[in-house]
Curated annotation (Swiss-Prot):
<feature type="transmembrane region" description="Helical">
    <location>
        <begin position="9"/>
        <end position="29"/>
    </location>
</feature>
<feature type="active site">
    <location>
        <position position="139"/>
    </location>
</feature>
<comment type="similarity">
    <text>Belongs to the peptidase A8 family.</text>
</comment>
<feature type="transmembrane region" description="Helical">
    <location>
        <begin position="65"/>
        <end position="85"/>
    </location>
</feature>
<comment type="function">
    <text>This protein specifically catalyzes the removal of signal peptides from prolipoproteins.</text>
</comment>
<dbReference type="GO" id="GO:0005886">
    <property type="term" value="C:plasma membrane"/>
</dbReference>
<keyword id="KW-1003">Cell membrane</keyword>
<keyword id="KW-0812">Transmembrane</keyword>
<keyword id="KW-0645">Protease</keyword>
<keyword id="KW-0997">Cell inner membrane</keyword>
<comment type="pathway">
    <text>Protein modification; lipoprotein biosynthesis (signal peptide cleavage).</text>
</comment>
<keyword id="KW-1133">Transmembrane helix</keyword>
<feature type="active site">
    <location>
        <position position="121"/>
    </location>
</feature>
<feature type="transmembrane region" description="Helical">
    <location>
        <begin position="134"/>
        <end position="154"/>
    </location>
</feature>
<dbReference type="Pfam" id="PF01252">
    <property type="entry name" value="Peptidase_A8"/>
</dbReference>
<protein>
    <recommendedName>
        <fullName>Lipoprotein signal peptidase</fullName>
        <ecNumber>3.4.23.36</ecNumber>
    </recommendedName>
</protein>
<feature type="transmembrane region" description="Helical">
    <location>
        <begin position="100"/>
        <end position="120"/>
    </location>
</feature>
Length: 165
C-alpha cells in the first residue's frame, strides 16, 4: 500500500502566515505611537490600535477574562485543524490551505494576547467618516481561510441521489 502525503505538508503556510503577522506587528509597535496614523491611500491608513477583544472588538470591554478565553480558543481550534490536516490527503488543496491560514492567523493573534495582553491591529480602511474596524495580517488569514472553507463546501457538494421506486 502506498503512503500518500497528508495535509500536514501545508503547515509551511501556517508558519509563513505566522511570521508575516508577527513581523508586521513588530514593525508597527516599534515605529508607531498608539493611535498614530499614516495615510497611505485616500481610503487606507496604517493606524496602530490595541484590540482587547476579538473581531470587531467583540468582548473588548470586559474585565480581562476574554484574553484567556481567546487564548484557549486559538489553541483548541489550531489543534483541531492540525488533526484535520493529518487526516486529509495533500491533494485536498483548498481545504488544507484554508486550515493552514486559520492556524497561522489564530496563533499570531494568540501570541499577541500572551505577550501584550491585546492584539495589535493597524490596517484601517475607510470612506469619508466611516471606518471599517482596524485589523491585521492574522485577521486577513483567518478570513481568507474561512472563505476558502465555504468555497470548498460549495465546490464539493454532491447532487442528492435520486431514489428509484
Amino acid at each position: 500500500m502506498t503512503k500518500s502525503k497528508s495535509g500536514l505538508s501545508f503547515l509551511w503556510l501556517s508558519a509563513v502566515t505566522f511570521l508575516l503577522d508577527l513581523s508586521s506587528k513588530y514593525f508597527v509597535v516599534k515605529n508607531f505611537e498608539l493611535y498614530e496614523s499614516i495615510n497611505i491611500l485616500p481610503v487606507f491608513n496604517l493606524t496602530y490600535v490595541r484590540n482587547y477583544g476579538a473581531a470587531f472588538s467583540f468582548l473588548a470591554d470586559h474585565d480581562g477574562w476574554q484574553k484567556y478565553f481567546f487564548i484557549v480558543l486559538a489553541i483548541a481550534i489550531s489543534l483541531m485543524l492540525c488533526y484535520f490536516l493529518a487526516k486529509n490527503q495533500a491533494t485536498q488543496k483548498l481545504q488544507n490551505i484554508a486550515y493552514a491560514l486559520i492556524i497561522g492567523g489564530a496563533l499570531g493573534n494568540m501570541i499577541d494576547r500572551l505577550y501584550h495582553g491585546f492584539v495589535v491591529d493597524f490596517f484601517d480602511f475607510y470612506w469619508d467618516i466611516y471606518h471599517y474596524p482596524v485589523f491585521n495580517v492574522a485577521d486577513i488569514a483567518i478570513s481568507l481561510g474561512a472563505g476558502l472553507m465555504i468555497l470548498d463546501a460549495f465546490k464539493n457538494r454532491h447532487e442528492p441521489e435520486q431514489r428509484t421506486e
